[in-house]
Amino acid sequence: MHKKETSLSHSKIANEMMNYINTYIDTPINIDHMALEFKISKFHFHRIFKEQMGENIYECIQSIRLQKASNLLITNQSSTISKIASLCGYSSQSSFLRAFKQRFEITPKQWRQGGYKEYSNKILKHSNTLSLIEKNYISQEPKMVNIEKRICYYIREKGYGFNSLKTWQKLKAWVYSNNIKEYSLLGIYHDNPILTKPKDCHYVAAIMLKEEDLLENTNLPYFNLYSGLCAEFSFEGKYEDILKLIQWVYHYWLPTSGYEATTIPSYIKFEKNDYFDNTGTFVVK
């Protein structure tokens, strides 16, 4: 296998595994079974994942579980701590409590009672663009919309904003080279930006196709966009304003809305994307 083919194969394996982890985070994830699915040895599987994602696969799974839980503890006020632990794949509440305290330095109960704000401040004081926002930062009620499953081709990046312009320009070139006429631009936010250091945040820039058929001879990975009921907000501003919108939704709107979040990540549909179309602004839903 040529070097380019090997690199594409390794990228495909790692990306498919990340999609699997995020989709089935509420279940036990068997690495031996997944290695068999990819028809490679467990050792080779671990090496490929770390080479592509920059972290150990077990550490990655643990990190995703805890990030999901840290959000749900804030948004899902009527859910018990044990239920949230279960939703994020922990079969034992004691192991969840131990892992959570080791990561965030406080208990889930203390976190839920407002401890997350102090944790956020430690992250935000090193950020030039983000800050804790007030409850009245945005004043609007969303539309409740049902999202259908659609095929998305994507580029995954680690770190909010570090490579976004370059990533979207690559996707623009991909759209033109594949002669795609009807599509939508999506940004998928796997981490809450004020609960995770910007350099550690996972972000996916995606092209959602109108057609249901898969493309042939393309080197980009794909996934099926999650279907279900979503709250849709309209917003216009700069790139960093999008992250402030996400903060407001998670920390102010959701906890008092009567709705509860799931482990599915939030995403943005761009009506205008300055990194893609040079319009000078971002208009999102």
Give residue ranges: language-model regions.
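Short secondary-structure junction/hinge motifs that connect adjacent elements
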Residues: N30-K39, L185-I188
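A solvent-exposed interaction/effector surface
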Residues: F43, R47-I48, E55-E59, S63, ...
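Short, Lys/Arg-enriched, disordered terminal segments
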Residues: M1-S11, S127-E134
